[in-house]
């Protein structure tokens, strides 16, 4: 059995027939499976015990040898080895084919590898393989050409004419002969020569052939191995046959497919022995070829083989493919032991780090622990009796359970887990009933509510797992959201309402104007009903200052840590969030958790005290509504008249009418807000941020306003009524459009957003923080992101938590904002520094960025900046790629789906929302493309024959003309100076054009700004660095233009680092370096272009990826997370990273030897770069010793 942690990479290749025979435990000769009477496997059949091992532990087929003492004996009667039955999962068999057959993957894939090697078209190849045409193998002295196809009649004529002077054949045998003859070295030389001489289509073909030839040459695979003489038979336990209740059998489709192969093979053997006529043998060979094709990839060629009920049988390829395939179903998503699930209810009395676990569930989950403790404490004599005690639920079991779960965290998860906060650890508290209780403040992270949501519980078993759960996953340690560094655990709903009510002040309340000597006296007065909760009073603080406040605020400030000062204002949701963030920044985790629990207790208590509820009388309709509507009607009528007289166009009328109604709606809303009392229940709920918003109040008490029709165009007939008055039939009908569209959108959005997240995770899963400093001198310049006049992302947001690359000085006062020392020490900018830079009016700052990071696999600490989830420095081993993918994908469901239709305006609609994000990350040509200037210069706009043209005059006087398509809006003005890459018309820029004009730096800035724009317009904040990680992955590859003296192939995609390395080698040997141009890959393409074939195969296009990998003999270095999960190793991130795992304790006072260094640093980390500077110095010293 292979030991999991002693290999660093895994390789895939073609299997030669000898290799398959070597692996095999025996030949399967008969198509039989099991005997219908004895239900025992048939000898030499597909389930044969002699080949695959015994069906029952330590027992041979005939029963002569039973029991473990005969271990390893081979029975002399039935030939079965006595061993564990589990070997039936591991032992392969094989089928010796009577005629060679081609492997469909290599013949049918795109491009056809066999076709490329033989320089034949796949169509010609198919004719030969399926016995339609002959192929000339040896022309001899005939006028025929090698590899020429002959029909049956032509072949006969030539046979009669030339006799045995030439050789031709059909089927896989003929192709095999041709493949054996290939000399790879020579072919590669010829093709390289051809590359220099030809161009166009022929050059492309030559490059593709050379790729395949090089692949075979480098990998040590032989071309003839693409033709199979032997078919391996996978172990029987992986294609089981089980008896159903009714005595019938259910079997895997593979058994059917294998049976067809064996039947046809045996028939072919018999025909060959009998010396049957050629035509019959040929037909049988063709059928054998088709049977093997169906076994490997059913349905790839011709009609798929179907089982009962016309269902296509699942072949070996289907076993790997898709969501239900081996990769995604069993290797990347396993079911786990020690887990349970139940409905969740709120636990308002829990502390931040606790959850309520139902007693019976806890007993089941912790059963082994409880049993062990029962034995240890002497309640039971052995494990068996302890198990009985637990099953009978004796009273002492509960006491033991209490002990066991103390300090043993459990993990709670809610599907869909959109980001890492979807699974957190808690300390369990036993509760009665059958529902899990969770803390109300973690609901935001889980996106949970209590309308019947369920959650799963998992138990971390080992001590390490428990420690990690407690230190890294405990809810109290996950207060900040990794996507923007803002608190995710902050008060909501009732808690907000209670705090808001508590901190409000009311004029003329009982006890207003009273003055107290300290807070205690004020509280005493309140307890004795001398002063009300919201009356304005004056209190002297400890430091002697007098403060006008209310009793409510005094109570509220009791839970606020003193360091934060006295909070003397009305606390709505935003203020509370700020308080939490402030507390976290200044006082850290533990204090914040306490603060949250304090606010929770107060909030619930006082929202109950307030007795805030909602009733029909709370909704008061403003008096002014009638008047406002009447005025609007009048204006609309005027416009209608103008339209009928032909003074304005339909378009103008539409726009004006919509303007009027929007205006009227706003006025009604303003009037409504003015009439509501600030202690009105509905008003308080909305303004505190507990539930609802002004728009919803407007619909209840003002007017519903304008609605959109199904296409998204706004209907110019408003709904004048509100829900308090009730809608007319027509109004009701109009509003159904919006309601239905909302629901349909939500459903679509969830699926699209999930798929986007999956692609993002796949492209960035191997980005891990791997070193302290990559030593780059490059960086990016950041400035505020603006959209026309409004700012989308302010400069300070982009700077905070990043490492600066230049000294920043205040332009007016000359004050140093960022010192040289800070730049040299790579310290991140604080919030205060970032704000100071923005306030100083500085436009742009150069910072370190993931985009320009030079770390080979992953990123370095300084380029990444601070860890948003903790606010501290990022650790080596943090899987920042996954965090970035989750941060971008998780808010995806909040983005809109719609393409905005500007009511009937000409010109393409610009895509927005989720589709726009997808368009950017996939680097697609956008809908409604803008024209981009290819050079700097000044603008002239002309009209030629009714078409508009933009002429750019360069500085050297050259002119360039761009035709403007009909209906496009021009963005530039006459005489304006522009730079290359600027947009000339409205619309979205094609990123590939931008890459050509402005190079990678231009595209990076553009993509970053565009993605931010979409999210910010929806009110979602995401930190730049997450988007930068994705952009970096999209720009990892370059396309080779000229190979120079390197081994590289023109037209190939290659990693920038590999490219630089190859060039360095070439230059060192005095050769010409290769020339390449940067390419922008969409995330799907980038995922498939990764070094790891396991990761690519488990993502999409499984068969294609594996075919290519096998031919190239690819090696997977297992650097990413997915590859390691697939083969069952610990992921190389976090505590699973080799530098954290290979810890060897050396005795004190012993010298540190060279071999210790080898033990301490595995192969891959022996690189110096992995060490921090101090470590390097230590190392050099020890080596000198």
UniProtKB/Swiss-Prot annotation:
**What Gene Ontology terms for biological process does this UniProt record contain?**
DNA-templated transcription
Sites where the protein binds Zn(2+) 2 = 774, 853, 860, 863
Q: How is the cofactor bound?
A: Binds 1 Mg(2+) ion per subunit. Binds 2 Zn(2+) ions per subunit.
Which cofactors, if any, are listed as required? Answer: Mg(2+); Zn(2+)
Which InterPro entries is this protein grouped with? DNA-dir_RpoC_beta_prime, DNA-dir_RpoC_beta_prime_bact, RNA_pol_asu, RNA_pol_N, RNA_pol_Rpb1_1, RNA_pol_Rpb1_3, RNA_pol_Rpb1_3_sf, RNA_pol_Rpb1_4
Task: Please verify whether the record's keywords include Glycoprotein.
Answer: no
Supply the gene name. Answer: rpoC
Q: Does the keyword Nucleotidyltransferase apply?
A: yes
Assigned GO CC terms: DNA-directed RNA polymerase complex
Species per Swiss-Prot/TrEMBL record: Desulforamulus reducens (strain ATCC BAA-1160 / DSM 100696 / MI-1) (Desulfotomaculum reducens)
Alphabetical list of Gene3D superfamilies matching this protein:
1.10.132.30, 1.10.150.390, 1.10.1790.20, 1.10.40.90, 2.40.40.20, 2.40.50.100, RNA polymerase II, clamp domain, RNA polymerase Rpb1, domain 3
Keywords of this entry: DNA-directed RNA polymerase, Magnesium, Metal-binding, Nucleotidyltransferase, Transcription, Transferase, Zinc
Please state which protein family the record places this protein in: Belongs to the RNA polymerase beta' chain family.
Residues that coordinate or bind Mg(2+) = 449, 451, 453
Query: What is the protein's name according to its record?
Result: DNA-directed RNA polymerase subunit beta'
The organism's place on the tree of life at top rank: Bacteria
Q: Which GO terms describe its molecular function?
A: DNA binding; DNA-directed RNA polymerase activity; magnesium ion binding; zinc ion binding
Sequence positions that bind Zn(2+) 1? 60, 62, 75, 78
**Role, per record:** DNA-dependent RNA polymerase catalyzes the transcription of DNA into RNA using the four ribonucleoside triphosphates as substrates.
For this protein, the Enzyme Commission number is 2.7.7.6
Q: How does it assemble?
A: The RNAP catalytic core consists of 2 alpha, 1 beta, 1 beta' and 1 omega subunit. When a sigma factor is associated with the core the holoenzyme is formed, which can initiate transcription.
Record's catalysed reaction(s):
RNA(n) + a ribonucleoside 5'-triphosphate = RNA(n+1) + diphosphate
């Amino acid at each position: 059995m292979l030991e999991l942690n002693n290999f660093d990479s895994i390789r895939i290749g073609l299997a030669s027939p000898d290799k398959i025979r070597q692996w095999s435990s025996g030949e399967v000769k008969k198509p039989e499976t099991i005997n219908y009477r004895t239900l025992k496997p048939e000898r030499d059949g597909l389930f044969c015990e002699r080949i695959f091992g015994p069906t029952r532990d330590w027992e041979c087929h005939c029963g002569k040898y039973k029991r473990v003492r005969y271990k390893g004996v081979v029975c002399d009667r039935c030939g079965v080895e006595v061993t564990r039955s589990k070997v039936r999962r591991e032992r392969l068999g094989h089928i010796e084919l009577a005629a060679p057959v081609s492997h469909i993957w290599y013949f049918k894939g795109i491009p056809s590898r066999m076709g490329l090697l033989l320089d034949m078209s796949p169509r010609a190849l198919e004719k030969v393989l399926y016995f339609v045409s002959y192929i000339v193998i040896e022309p001899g002295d005939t006028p025929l050409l090698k590899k020429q196809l002959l029909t049956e009649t032509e072949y006969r004529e030539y046979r009669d004419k030339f006799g045995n002077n030439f050789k031709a054949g059909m089927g896989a045998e003929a192709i095999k002969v041709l493949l054996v003859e290939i000399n790879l070295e020579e072919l590669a030389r010829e093709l390289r020569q051809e590359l220099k001489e030809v161009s166009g289509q022929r050059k492309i073909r030559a490059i593709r052939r050379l790729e395949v030839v090089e692949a075979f040459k480098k990998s040590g695979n032989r071309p003839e191995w693409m033709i199979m003489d032997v078919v391996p038979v996978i172990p029987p336990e992986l294609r089981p046959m089980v008896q159903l209740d009714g005595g019938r059998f259910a079997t895997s489709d593979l058994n059917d497919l294998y049976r067809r192969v064996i039947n046809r093979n045996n028939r072919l053997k018999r025909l060959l022995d009998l010396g049957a006529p050629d035509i019959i043998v040929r037909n049988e060979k063709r059928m054998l070829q088709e049977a093997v094709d169906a076994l490997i990839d059913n349905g790839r060629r011709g009609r798929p083989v179907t089982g009962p009920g016309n269902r296509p049988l699942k072949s070996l390829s289907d076993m790997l493919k898709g969501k239900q395939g081996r990769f995604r179903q069993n290797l990347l998503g396993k079911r786990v032991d020690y887990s349970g699930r139940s409905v969740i209810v709120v636990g308002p009395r829990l502390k931040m780090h606790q959850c309520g676990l139902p007693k019976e569930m806890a007993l089941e989950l912790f059963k082994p622990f409880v049993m062990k403790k029962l034995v240890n404490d002497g309640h039971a004599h052995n494990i068996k009796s302890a198990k009985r005690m637990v099953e009978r639920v004796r009273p002492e079991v509960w006491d033991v359970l209490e002990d066991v779960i103390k300090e043993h965290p459990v993990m709670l998860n809610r599907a869909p887990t959109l980001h890492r906060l979807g699974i957190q650890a808690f300390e369990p508290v036993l509760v009665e009933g059958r529902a899990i209780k969770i803390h109300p403040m973690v609901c935001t992270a889980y996106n949970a509510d209590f309308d019947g949501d369920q959650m799963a519980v998992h138990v971390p078993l080992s001590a390490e797992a428990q420690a990690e759960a407690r230190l890294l996953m405990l809810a109290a340690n996950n207060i900040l959201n990794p996507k923007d560094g803002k608190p995710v655990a902050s008060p909501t709903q009732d808690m907000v309402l209670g705090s808001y009510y508590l901190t409000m002040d009311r004029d003329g309340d009982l006890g207003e104007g009273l003055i107290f000597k300290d807070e205690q006296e004020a509280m005493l007065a309140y307890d004795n009903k001398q002063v009300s909760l919201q009356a304005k009073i004056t209190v002297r603080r400890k430091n002697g200052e007098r403060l006008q406040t209310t009793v409510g605020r005094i109570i509220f400030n009791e839970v606020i840590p003193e360091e934060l000062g006295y909070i003397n204002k009305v606390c709505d949701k935003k203020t509370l969030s700020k308080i939490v963030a402030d507390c976290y920044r200044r006082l850290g985790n533990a204090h914040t958790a306490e603060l949250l629990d304090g606010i929770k207790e107060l909030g619930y208590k006082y929202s109950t005290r307030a007795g805030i509820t909602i009733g029909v009388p709370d909704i008061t309709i403003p008096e002014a509504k009638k008047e406002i509507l009447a005025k609007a009607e009048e204006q609309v009528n005027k416009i209608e008249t103008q339209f009928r007289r032909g003074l304005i166009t339909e378009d103008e009328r539409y726009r004006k009418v919509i303007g009027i109604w929007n205006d009227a709606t706003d006025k009604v809303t303003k009037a409504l807000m003015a009439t509501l009392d600030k202690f009105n229940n509905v008003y308080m709920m909305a303004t505190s941020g507990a539930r609802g918003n002004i728009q919803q109040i407007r619909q209840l008490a003002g007017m519903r306003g304008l609605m959109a029709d199904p296409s998204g165009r706004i209907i110019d007939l408003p709904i004048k009524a509100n829900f308090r008055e009730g809608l007319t039939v027509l109004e009701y009908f109009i509003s159904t459009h919006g309601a239905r569209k909302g629901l349909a959108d939500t459903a679509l959005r969830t699926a699209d957003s999930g798929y986007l997240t999956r692609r993002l995770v796949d492209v960035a899963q191997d980005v891990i923080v791997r070193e302290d400093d990559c030593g780059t001198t490059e960086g990016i310049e950041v400035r505020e992101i603006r959209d026309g006049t409004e700012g989308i992302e302010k400069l300070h947001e982009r700077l905070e938590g990043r490492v600066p690359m230049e000294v920043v000085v205040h332009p007016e006062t000359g004050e140093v904002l960022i010192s040289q020392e800070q730049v040299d020490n790579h310290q991140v900018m604080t919030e205060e520094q970032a704000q100071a830079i923005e306030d100083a009016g500085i436009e742009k700052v150069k910072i370190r960025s993931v985009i320009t990071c030079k770390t080979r696999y992953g990123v370095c600490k300084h380029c990444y900046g601070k860890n948003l989830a903790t606010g501290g420095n990022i650790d080596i081993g943090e899987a920042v790629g996954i965090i970035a993918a989750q941060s971008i994908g998780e808010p995806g469901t909040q983005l809109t789906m719609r393409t905005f239709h500007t009511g009937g305006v000409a010109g393409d609609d610009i895509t927005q929302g989720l589709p726009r994000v997808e368009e950017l990350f996939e680097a697609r040509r956008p809908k409604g493309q803008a024209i981009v200037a290819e050079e700097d210069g000044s603008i002239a706009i002309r009209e030629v024959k009714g078409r508009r043209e933009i002429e750019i005059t360069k500085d050297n006087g050259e002119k360039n003309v761009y035709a403007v398509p009909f209906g496009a809006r021009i963005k530039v003005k006459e005489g304006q100076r522009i730079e290359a890459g600027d947009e000339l018309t409205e619309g979205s820029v094609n990123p590939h054009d931008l890459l050509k004009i402005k190079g990678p730096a231009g595209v990076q800035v553009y993509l970053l700004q565009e993605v931010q724009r979409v999210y910010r317009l929806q009110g979602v904040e995401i930190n730049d660095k997450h988007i930068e990680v994705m952009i970096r992955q999209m720009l990892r590859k370059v396309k080779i233009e000229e190979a120079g003296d390197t081994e590289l192939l023109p037209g190939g995609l290659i990693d920038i680092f590999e490219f630089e390395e190859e060039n360095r080698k070439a230059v060192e040997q005095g050769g010409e370096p290769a020339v390449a141009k940067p390419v922008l890959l969409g995330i799907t393409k980038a995922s498939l272009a990764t070094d790891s074939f396991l990761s690519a195969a488990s993502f999409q296009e499984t068969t294609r990826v594996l075919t290519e990998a096998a031919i190239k003999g690819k090696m997977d270095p297992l650097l990413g997370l997915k590859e390691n999960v697939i083969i069952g190793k610990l992921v190389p991130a976090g505590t699973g990273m080799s530098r954290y795992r290979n810890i060897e304790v050396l005795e004190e006072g012993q010298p540190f030897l060279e071999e210790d260094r080898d033990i301490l640093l595995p192969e891959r980390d022996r690189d110096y770069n992995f060490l921090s500077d101090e470590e390097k110095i230590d190392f050099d010293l020890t080596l000198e010793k």
